[in-house]
């Protein structure tokens, strides 16, 4: 169990003036001196809790909480359409269903060419990723589940849309026109370009058509501003600088109920500071006025001959869109991952931001960025970007990935590291605390019981009622948890 130093107060908390700039869930933040810490109240201490599915302890949670796991792919899981459920459960969102149930639309981050899962016509007959949709009770009992998108690749995160759909993101730029990615597996057999976003209606089927004008890059997550009808997008370009983007549809999706493919993609730049290095450590409460630079060619197709290895390398292709923005002054970030919109603010995570500047543009073998996490907030109406948090100490925060907001404005962060993985809460008062600890053990290892403590959490999302937190274990043998209990009592 981690020490009290893990429950540190926010180092980059806003001052009173900064809070007024930000508003929203973090308007209550107050400045804390560097190094200030605070022990979480005793009722937040984590303890082993048995899974309602079978009595096994898979999570440590605060007192009074329960959970049920489902769709555990250590064993074969058949969906209602006959599909064998793939693993790599990743980003996810929850929507209202009938009879008090919840629709989950869940990503499966499967890479490399191969046969798609599920029925119907896939986007790419050699794409193994996609989404599944699950109707589930608030306490984690599955009513039905089916394939809702197939034939994609590396479906990482995404974001919920207020009209009732999920935008799923491909974290790759693979295709027949691009050389092999980090796995070394040839892309020659792929039939479509990848690196796009797709829309999936809750409880329904995706039309399997990519929204290409929203960019072909290593997409991670999206967050939608219903006031202006603008979609904000994060990029997780592992070995190179990443960008923060916005996509402005030609028609307001709040009126049409869907994203169109005729919009404009733009990249964030800092006013007066071309190519601002926001991946490196920033001053406390750093605040920037931003502008947006256009991406002229958001969905490139590179020259290739079918059936032959493409001359364009993966490293060349994966920076193509971002380089257009950086040529016009776009800002450098480190590995932008989860994003969430709340009350006029887009919150997003930089997984390796906050450390010393990188010595080169890349590729960087252990990832671009030398910190262990930054949390940024972008005020959409004021076009102001503010740093909420940064650290180089994994005992404070260790590589934040997916993020969601609770009904009370607390951020729930999924850690993605090679050691113990936690869900962390970040309150409006600026307190960072442990919310859940992975204590999963394999049931199929030899002998059984091998620890899987470094399997990451992903896809945290609250039910529409706010009573249940659904979250995934992202691993080749994935699963989903429904966690419920006295959230208000612990300030989540």
Question: Where are the language model's segments positioned?
Answer:
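N-terminal secretory signal peptides and thylakoid transit peptides that target proteins
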Residues: 1-17
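Conserved small-residue
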Residues: 12-492
